[in-house]
């Protein structure tokens, strides 16, 4: 008889996964270790011995800073930053950037704590760690950094008073309250007296408005004289505010408007210091001086020089120099001069051509 063989199809390498649920009785802890402590197995083992490994996670701080690992959101009740191998936190401080603080804050539960192993985290208010922790959303309380619990705030509902609609009465916009009446939807409509149930003595009299004007429309009294001056307004003459002594006082020119050496400063658009008037007066004086100098330069008859434009028997290349600008070429030296006869004497008197 041949021997029987039994084959086991079950996998021998199936890992056993255990889901640890975070409750108030087993708070989860995250240990952030600097790179230097990884080479000191004894120190790392001593730290892990003081924590329950079922609810404690260990992450390297340099890998978190480089973005190689991600932290679950709102998971940990305590995040503990371990010291370096030499007992200081010089290496860990260099890795705690603003991005790392943001990741740690997201991983903390509401009301969770962020501490250091040596207890020096967040003790210096002027330190960079304290400022970055505050900027990431943590608050300092009792010497530790906490993530505030905003769920504790309770929204208070605002209730508004409502009118009591329990009464079966309808209020008309044009009269008193009337009782409700049922109107059939099919067949002929019955005339319903809306005031049958209301006694006449209880019905107040409503005066009809005098003006049947639509709402929101105003009226203007055109009898008012809008152009007339209001007697209640007291007008002040500006000239009476200054005395003769005030007018004699020199204007106080600001230092920035004072004349300087070099390029002349231009006055402001709405100048009030007197610089605009001063510059205008200087320009007027310069123009008057130039005009007086031009008027003084006059030539007498003896000082006039005779200008002979042509020579008898000599003509230009085009032969039209004496005919006028309409017949002269572009390079003619007589452009702008009136037509003349060849050999005619031309005199200049006060910039005017005298033929």
UniProtKB/Swiss-Prot annotation:
Where [2Fe-2S] cluster binds, per the record, is at: 257, 268, 271, 273
**Chain segments carrying region Disordered:** 189-214
Indicate the principal place this protein occupies in or around the cell.
cytoplasm
Which amino acid positions bind [4Fe-4S] cluster, per UniProt?
Answer: 318, 321, 329, 332
The record's region (N-terminal SAM-like domain) falls at 23-156
Give start-end positions of Basic and acidic residues composition bias.
190-213
- Indicate where this protein resides in the cell: Cytoplasm; Mitochondrion intermembrane space
Give the residue ranges for region: Linker.
Answer: 157-247
* UniProt keywords, alphabetically: 2Fe-2S, 4Fe-4S, Cytoplasm, Iron, Iron-sulfur, Metal-binding, Mitochondrion
Question: Segment Fe-S binding site A: which positions?
Answer: 257-273
Q: Where is this motif: Cx2C motif 1?
A: 318-321
Cofactors: [2Fe-2S] cluster; [4Fe-4S] cluster
A molecular function GO annotation: 2 iron, 2 sulfur cluster binding
Q: Does the keyword Iron apply?
A: yes
A GO CC annotation recorded here is: mitochondrial intermembrane space
Q: What is known of its domains?
A: The C-terminal domain binds 2 Fe-S clusters but is otherwise mostly in an intrinsically disordered conformation. The N-terminal domain has structural similarity with S-adenosyl-L-methionine-dependent methyltransferases, but does not bind S-adenosyl-L-methionine. It is required for correct assembly of the 2 Fe-S clusters.
Its assembly, as annotated, is: Monomer. Interacts with TAH18. Interacts with MIA40.
This protein is called: Fe-S cluster assembly protein DRE2
């Amino acid at each position: 008889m041949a021997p029987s063989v039994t084959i086991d199809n079950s996998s021998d390498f199936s890992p056993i996964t255990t889901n640890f649920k975070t409750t108030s009785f087993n708070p989860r802890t995250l240990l952030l270790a600097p790179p230097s402590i990884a080479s000191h197995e004894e120190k790392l083992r001593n730290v892990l011995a003081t924590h329950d490994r079922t609810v404690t996670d260990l992450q390297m701080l340099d890998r978190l800073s480089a973005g190689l690992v991600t932290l679950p959101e709102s998971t940990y009740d305590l995040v503990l930053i371990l010291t370096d191998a030499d007992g200081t936190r010089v290496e860990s401080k260099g890795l705690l950037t603003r991005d790392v603080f943001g990741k740690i804050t997201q991983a903390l539960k509401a009301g969770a704590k962020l501490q250091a192993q040596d207890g020096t985290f967040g003790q210096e208010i002027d330190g960079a760690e304290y400022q970055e922790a505050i900027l990431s959303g943590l608050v300092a309380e009792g010497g530790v950094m906490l993530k505030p619990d905003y769920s504790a705030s309770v929204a208070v509902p605002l209730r508004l008073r409502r009118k009591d609609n329990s009464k079966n009465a309808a209020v008309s916009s044009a009269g008193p309250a009337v009782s409700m009446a049922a109107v059939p939807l099919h067949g002929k409509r019955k005339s319903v007296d809306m005031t049958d149930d209301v006694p006449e003595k209880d019905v107040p009299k409503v005066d009809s408005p005098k003006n049947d004007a639509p709402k929101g429309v105003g009226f203007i009294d055109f009898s008012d004289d809008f152009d007339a001056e209001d007697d209640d307004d007291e007008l002040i003459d500006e000239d009476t505010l200054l005395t003769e002594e005030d007018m004699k006082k020199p204007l106080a020119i600001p230092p920035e408007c004072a004349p300087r050496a070099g390029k002349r400063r231009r006055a402001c658009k709405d100048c009030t210091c007197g610089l605009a008037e001063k510059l205008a007066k200087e320009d007027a004086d310069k123009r008057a001086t130039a005009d007086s100098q031009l008027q003084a330069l006059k030539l007498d008859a003896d000082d006039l020089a005779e200008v002979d434009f042509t020579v008898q028997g000599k003509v230009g290349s085009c032969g039209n120099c004496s005919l006028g600008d309409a017949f002269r070429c572009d390079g003619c030296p007589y452009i702008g001069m009136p037509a003349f006869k060849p050999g005619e004497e031309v005199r200049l008197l006060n910039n005017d051509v005298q033929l």
